[in-house]
């Protein structure tokens, strides 16, 4: 066995033999190390045969990590390692081999698109009542709806499925999204065609695997015997189908270990729920373990993230425990408006690149892709290579291209080049219930030399009244646009066009997921704001063309390292040395369109725990700061971390009264007990503890414990070092009374003036340079900052 030093918490997991177990592992906890060492021990000690052990997860990345880690030991090679989807497929394949069902072909992830196109052709052939709706169908949106239904065991036609009675306790009839009732009918047709073709899609695998087990007891028995011990990683991400599948597989023995972090449950919109992991202990009478040590984040991130997530009520109480020390930083930048914020972020990245950091070490995490326009422009201007992971550059996104297509088509002159693509993009956006055949007929006239206006009116002349009315309305819209091109700014015209089309409302209504539709609508709102200072329509289109030219290549064609921009959803499970989080304001973090405040707080927690070194938070001073930062009292937390870190780095005889008090107060408040006992390992620890205890004794003697903010719990932390305080030098804590906490009073807030000396908890002493609308411009040693006075908590010196 390879020699790896495990913590006591990891060792407890490795030592677990049989029976149900639940492991809560914080971000960056090294849980994979504990899990594979448990598997290795169980094999080595012959508790289970390796081929009868299953290590699985929803996440392909987690499974790959497990597989790589297990490869170190020859005797663990027989352990079954697979995703939950692969487990479901294996069960279906077993049933097919027994002749219990037909399985002609398995389609991998992504093949659903081709199947959907065949389903749409069938719908048009059948002339279904909702056929006109198909012209505006967003394939990804519908397939996400289908995937969510299947993940939650929501059947297209539950009665037709004829499930056994016990299965009906968890399975249910699917419902259509509000305003998209025809989605359910299309789901039914989708399933009909899929079954006719004998296909199994990626989303079918867990659901169909579960269905096989509830239908066929013999198959259930075979599968249960095949897996005598099951370990599930990233359990917070499982959905109902996966949870119920695992419940059946492990029923005879419950040698079932679930590992995850409820604080990182951020995929509720697609079926994951914290209840699966939070209810696991009670459901299975499982033994509970905690892994609290984080090997990723330094002290500022640990303290701030821990304070943020502690506000959630629906969670397993636990605290991130520091191991890495105090080398990292969390910076908070307040900027007046989005362009300034983007320039500040790009400037920070450029400075770090100049210091030798690599682009691949950096990530910009956003709540919505709608946040990226100004960020992308600032990166392009500084020639910083970037990639938008999971999306495209903002000017290529369908919701933005949809608006721009109207402007391109309204340009004077003959329509050529991409004009047909623009036309096909907008003729039914928003819904006009015009057929593709009619759209082709209009464009045929354009290709023959007619203007788009003339082509629309010519087709209207021969159409039935309802269709003719819509064609004429569209012609009138383009006539209005053509007349406004030279008269209005791009911003004004786009705002008027969006209002006339009710475009954002259309985006919201045309999505089966509020999260998706709201993101697109927000993207349009952000783009309209982005266009505000871009001049005329011609100027805007030229600007976008230049952005496309200057954007440094396609990542698929250009191997250069890039800064990544991605949503927080995509960042879970990943880490970078340098993390940048813009728009830490109310309305974005948390997102104003979300009703689930606890999930929004979990999202912010995930973002805060991605960095292994430096985190940069940006907020607009013109908007309320994120309540997640306010309720966490971020300035006090970061200030306390800085003071404690400075004190721990000093020899005991150099600790001032203020620094000793910082240790006495801050170590317990920051939850540093485990760090100080297990990871600090300072040679001078006994002397430091003795000095802190002498301060407690001095405060107690003077009756100042409460007035100094010193608690019995804080004292116990230092008493655990088992040292005698001893006698310090005379006057060791002279001036301690200066640190007595004054009771708060209803006194007026300080009045600030230019030239005044002030102190900020993070940036230190500075001088007020300017004041405007509640925002102070202050010159600090490391540069000039603009700070919102209601949040900055400046102290007058």
Short names for language-model regions:
Residues 585-782:
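C-terminal accessory regions
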Residues 87, 283, 326-329, 357-487:
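ATPase/helicase motor core of nucleic-acid motors
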Residues 22-23, 27-35, 285-287, 293-384, ...:
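Helicase P-loop NTPase motor core
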Residues 1-102, 221, 303-306, 609:
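P-loop NTPase Walker
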Residues 16, 78, 97-191, 195-197, ...:
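ATP-hydrolysis module of ASCE/P-loop NTPase motor domains
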Residues 80-90, 231-234, 259, 368, ...:
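Conserved helicase core region in the C-terminal RecA-like lobe
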Residues 3-15, 19-27, 62, 80, ...:
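Conserved helicase NTPase motor core
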Residues 180, 415-417, 430, 458-570, ...:
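Accessory C-terminal helicase-associated subdomains
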């Amino acid at each position: 066995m390879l020699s790896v030093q495990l913590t006591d918490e990891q060792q407890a997991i490795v030592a677990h033999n049989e029976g149900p177990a639940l492991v809560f592992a914080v971000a960056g906890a090294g849980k994979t190390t504990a899990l594979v060492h448990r598997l290795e021990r169980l094999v080595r000690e012959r508790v289970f045969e390796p081929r009868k052990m299953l290590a699985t997860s929803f996440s392909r990345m987690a499974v790959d990590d497990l597989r790589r880690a297990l490869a170190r030991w020859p005797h663990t090679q027989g352990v079954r390692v697979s995703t939950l989807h692969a487990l479901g497929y294996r069960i279906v394949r077993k049933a097919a081999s027994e002749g219990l069902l037909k399985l002609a072909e398995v389609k991998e992830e992504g093949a659903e698109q081709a199947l959907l196109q065949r389903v749409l052709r069938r719908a048009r052939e059948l002339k279904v009542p909702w056929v006109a709706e198909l012209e505006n169908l967003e394939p990804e949106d519908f397939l996400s709806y289908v995937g969510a239904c299947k993940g939650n065991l929501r059947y297209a036609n539950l009665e037709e499925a004829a499930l056994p009675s016990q299965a009906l306790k968890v399975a249910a009839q699917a419902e259509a999204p509000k305003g998209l009732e025809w989605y359910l009918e299309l789901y039914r047709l989708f399933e009909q065609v899929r079954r006719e073709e004998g296909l199994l899609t990626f989303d079918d695998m867990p659901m169909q695997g579960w269905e096989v087990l509830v239908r066929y007891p013999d198959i259930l028995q075979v599968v249960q015997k095949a897996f005598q011990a099951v370990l599930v990683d990233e359990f917070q991400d499982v959905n109902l189908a996966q949870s119920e599948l695992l419940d059946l597989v492990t029923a005879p023995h419950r040698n079932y270990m679930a590992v995850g972090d409820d604080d990182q449950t951020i995929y509720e919109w697609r079926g994951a729920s914290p209840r699966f992991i939070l209810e696991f202990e009670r459901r299975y009478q499982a033994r509970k373990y905690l892994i609290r040590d984080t090997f990723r984040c330094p002290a500022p991130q640990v303290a701030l993230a821990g304070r943020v997530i502690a506000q959630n009520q629906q969670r397993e109480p636990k605290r991130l425990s520091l191991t890495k020390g105090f080398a990292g930083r969390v910076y908070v930048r307040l900027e007046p408006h989005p362009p300034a914020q983007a320039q500040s972020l790009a400037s920070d990245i450029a400075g770090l690149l100049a210091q030798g950091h690599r682009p691949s070490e950096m990530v910009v995490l956003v709540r919505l892709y709608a946040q990226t326009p100004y960020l992308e422009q600032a990166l392009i201007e500084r020639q910083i290579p970037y990639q938008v992971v999971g999306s495209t550059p903002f000017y290529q996104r369908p919701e933005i291209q949809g608006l721009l297509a109207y402007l391109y088509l309204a340009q004077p002159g003959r329509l050529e080049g991409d004009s047909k693509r623009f036309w096909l993009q907008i003729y039914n956006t928003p819904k006009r219930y015009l057929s593709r055949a009619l759209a082709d007929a209009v464009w045929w006239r354009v290709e023959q030399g007619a203007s788009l206006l003339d082509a629309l009116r010519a087709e209207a002349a021969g159409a039935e009244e309802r269709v003719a009315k819509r064609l004429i309305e569209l012609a009138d819209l383009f006539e209005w646009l053509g007349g406004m091109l030279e008269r209005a700014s791009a911003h004004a015209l786009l705002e008027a066009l969006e209002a006339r089309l009710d475009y954002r409302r259309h985006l919201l209504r045309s999505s089966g997921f509020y999260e998706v539709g709201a993101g697109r609508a927000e993207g349009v709102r952000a783009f309209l704001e982005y266009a505000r200072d871009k001049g005329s329509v011609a100027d805007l289109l030229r600007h976008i063309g230049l952005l496309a030219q200057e954007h440094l290549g396609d990542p698929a064609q250009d191997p250069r390292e890039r800064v990544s921009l991605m949503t927080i959803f995509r960042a879970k499970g990943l880490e970078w040395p340098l993390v940048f989080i813009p728009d830490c304001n109310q309305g974005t973090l948390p997102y104003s369109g979300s009703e689930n405040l606890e999930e929004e707080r979990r999202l912010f927690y995930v973002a805060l725990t991605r960095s292994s070194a430096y985190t940069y938070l940006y907020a607009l001073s013109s908007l309320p700061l994120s309540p997640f930062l306010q309720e966490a009292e971020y300035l006090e937390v970061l200030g306390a971390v800085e003071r404690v870190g400075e004190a721990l780095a000093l020899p005991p005889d150099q600790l001032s009264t203020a620094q000793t008090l910082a240790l006495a107060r801050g170590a317990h408040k920051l939850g540093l007990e485990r760090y100080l006992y297990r990871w600090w390992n300072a040679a001078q620890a006994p002397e430091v503890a003795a000095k802190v205890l002498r301060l407690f004794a001095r405060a107690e003697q003077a009756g100042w414990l409460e007035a100094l903010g010193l608690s019995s719990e804080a004292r116990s932390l230092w008493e655990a070092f088992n040292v005698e305080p001893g006698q310090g030098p005379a006057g060791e804590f002279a001036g301690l009374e200066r640190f007595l906490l004054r009771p708060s009073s209803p006194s007026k807030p300080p009045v600030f003036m230019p030239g005044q000396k002030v102190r900020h908890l993070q940036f230190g002493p500075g001088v007020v340079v300017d004041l405007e609308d509640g925002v102070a411009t202050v010159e600090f040693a490391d540069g000039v900052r603009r700070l919102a006075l209601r949040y900055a908590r400046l102290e007058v010196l």
